UniProtKB/Swiss-Prot annotation:
Keyword Acetylation: yes
Example of a GO MF term: structural molecule activity
Modified-residue entries (N-acetylserine), positions: S2
CC terms in the record's Gene Ontology section: helical viral capsid; ribonucleoprotein complex
InterPro entries: Pltvir_coat
Organism: Papaya mosaic potexvirus (PMV)
Family the entry assigns: Belongs to the potexvirus capsid protein family.
Name of the featured protein: Coat protein
Acetylation in keyword set: yes
Annotated signal peptide: none
Keyword tags: Acetylation, Capsid protein, Helical capsid protein, Ribonucleoprotein, Virion
Amino acid sequence: MSKSSMSTPNTAFPAITQEQMSSIKVDPTSNLLPSQEQLKSVSTLMVAAKVPAASVTTVALELVNFCYDNGSSAYTTVTGPSSIPEISLAQLASIVKASGTSLRKFCRYFAPIIWNLRTDKMAPANWEASGYKPSAKFAAFDFFDGVENPAAMQPPSGLIRSPTQEERIANATNKQVHLFQAAAQDNNFTSNSAFITKGQISGSTPTIQFLPPPE
């Protein structure tokens, strides 16, 4: 057999070399977070609204802290002042949305920071109303899934502690419960007449499927 017939055939993607691997930049990215362009837009709009450029992060965290206690969904009513007298938290939330990202994505970007600021000190205000047990109360915020996202802003010395497995499970379960409740409230009838709806909120009953417990 000739050497030419034993050679590696041409491929669309030639095998990578060790030198090439060493030169590739592999910073983490996540589509669960705002893009860098959106973050820059928020920062620019905040400065235009008279937030000092050196304070945009700390002022942003005031909004994140509110959402930690009250939620970051599109239906959350943001209230209260910021530390900048002329700017309310509601105005900051509007700036975030004007950038093209959602409030939850924005909060998720700062999740590791608020985790360090509040964990084991002051739980989310609504933890009990949300159905969390005391042992998992520090996971009772709706952007908890950003805490361990490596593309989010990281605290200078890392997380004060990683979430426990109980906290992860409690948050994931609570998220599914909220999805179930939203589905139950969805009305797919064409009329609100009780004759048509028979008093039902939805024409089909949503279900939650749980995995069996480990044996």
